[in-house]
Curated annotation (Swiss-Prot):
Annotated source species: Shewanella halifaxensis (strain HAW-EB4)
Annotated protein name in UniProt: Co-chaperone protein HscB homolog
Family: Belongs to the HscB family.
InterPro entries cross-referenced by the UniProt entry: DnaJ_domain, HscB, HscB_C_sf, HscB_oligo_C, J_dom_sf
PANTHER family reported in the protein's UniProt record: IRON-SULFUR CLUSTER CO-CHAPERONE PROTEIN HSCB
Molecular function via GO: ATPase activator activity; protein-folding chaperone binding
J domain span: 2-74
A single GO cellular-component term on record: iron-sulfur cluster transfer complex
Subunit structure: Interacts with HscA and stimulates its ATPase activity.
Entry-linked HAMAP family: HscB
Physiological role: Co-chaperone involved in the maturation of iron-sulfur cluster-containing proteins. Seems to help targeting proteins to be folded toward HscA.
């Protein structure tokens, strides 16, 4: 299913989140199970299914990484259940350095500045990846789709690192 069509949006990495939320509320009002309280069991079941579908679509389009994956799915490249590893050794080396930095924060004299520095570094790198990703997602070339998949994998790694940094920060300041 094309989630962009469901919300009457053009397929794009950049989505107007306010418009997305507005369309979500409209769709929810139209199919909410409460509207079908006096309907047949089949209509009630369909309403619940449609509501779940709308919720899934909204969560997917709201999240930039999932949105990028959905765009690739629409082009015939499925990433959601893959176990492919990254091939970019430079990125993997950088990731190892970041993980070492995460470990060192626990023993740092100035964890605040190291945490801020890592947040900035992660954000800057994710912005760079996103900049490279956007034109690949609109391309019709399969090679570009494969490269987009690699960029999405990197964004997933960055999101995990960001989560780890947040956990380290929470543990230090709790």
């Amino acid at each position: 299913m094309n989630y962009f069509e469901l919300f009457s949006l053009l397929p794009s990495y950049d989505v107007d989140t306010a418009l997305l939320a507005e369309r979500y509320r409209e769709l929810q009002r139209a199919v909410h199970p409460d509207k079908f309280a006096n309907a047949s069991e089949q209509d009630k079941r369909l309403s619940v299914q449609r509501t779940a579908q709308i919720n899934d679509a909204f969560q997917t389009l709201k999240n930039p990484i999932q949105r990028a994956e959905h765009l690739l799915t629409l082009k015939g490249l499925e990433l959601s259940h893959e176990s492919t590893t990254l091939k970019d050794t430079q990125f993997l080396m950088q990731q190892m350095e970041w993980r070492e930095s995460l470990e060192e924060i626990k023993h740092s004299d100035d964890p605040d500045s190291e945490i801020a520095e890592l947040y900035d570094s992660f954000e800057q790198y994710a912005r760079q990846i996103t900049t490279e990703l956007k034109p690949l997602l609109v391309s019709e070339l399969e090679a570009d789709h494969l490269q987009a998949a690699e960029q999405i994998r990197k964004l997933k790694f960055m999101a995990k690192l960001q989560d780890e940094l947040t956990r380290v920060e929470d543990a230090l300041f709790d």
